[in-house]
Amino acid sequence: VSTALISVDLDRTMIYSSAALGFPLDASVTCVEMYDGGPLSYMSVRSTELLQKLASEAVVVPTTTRTVEQFDRIDLPGAPWRYAITTNGGNILVDGVPDASWRASFDDVDLPAVQQELAARADGDWVLKRRTADDLFCYLVVEPDAVPVGFMDDWSQWCAARGWNVSQQGRKIYSMPDVVSKSRAVAEVHARAVDDGSLRPESITLAAGDGALDADMLLAADHAIRPAHGELEALNFRPPGLTVTTATGGRAGEEILDWFFGRIAEHREP
């Protein structure tokens, strides 16, 4: 029975593109995701070993804004996962299968109305792609430097009045229902893991993530850490008690894993 539940964001927290990794693709690096026949995401070999070990000592819950399909592309060390969270909390995977009852709780989300309004507002050359994620939320892939001045503020205002929120991570602008959040899904997984006997009721919760969509998850955890890069770094997100890595890129991923082991050791029974 584990004494810690660890929810960990993936992209730019645990796994990295070659550009975001920050060090050469040599023998110390391993590919963990292929896409369209080519390598897409990497981890250092040390990170893969640490994550594998961590998954044997705690209830580790991969927690991502990726869709189920996008998550399934990743060959993440530590699998198979009893629980994983995708679609920013919109799906909980139990032994790899989306839980229908959890997904049904979001059936009232009015995605078409938001898509229609967004299509009218975001119609310039700066929009490269429009995507929906598991019929729960939508996002734009944009040229960041070409986004019109005021678009983010105006769109955020429109969404906020309707129970939605807007955030930008690199080239992606997400429009997300407030009810779809990582922290809500993590709380549900925590309850289920206690119920199924894999987690002690008094267990600590640990979390790591780099984006604005991770903020609620970091705030809800007993202890949380973020890398010194990414959207939260740009926002200077530093609430009391949050640890920030000294390293950036893939080395921050290693530092986060080391930190998890440190927190587990502190809370282990004497």
Segments (PLM) and residue ranges:
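A metal-dependent, Asp-based hydrolase signature
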Residues: R12, Y16-V32, A79-I92, D110-E117, ...
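Mg2+-dependent phosphoryl-transfer enzymes with acidic/Ser/Thr/Gly-rich catalytic loops
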Residues: S183-P270
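Short glycine-/acidic-enriched loop or helix-start segments at secondary-structure transitions
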Residues: S17-S18, F71-I74, D95-G96, D216-M217, ...
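Active-site neighborhood of HAD-like aspartate-dependent phosphohydrolases
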Residues: V1-P62, D72
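Proline-centered loop/turn at the N-terminus of a beta-strand
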Residues: L5, V59-V60, Y83, N165, ...
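A general structural motif
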Residues: V1-T3, E57, W81, D135, ...
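Active-site phosphate-binding/coordination module
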Residues: S41-G124
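Conserved acidic, metal-coordinating active-site core of Asp-based
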Residues: E117-A220
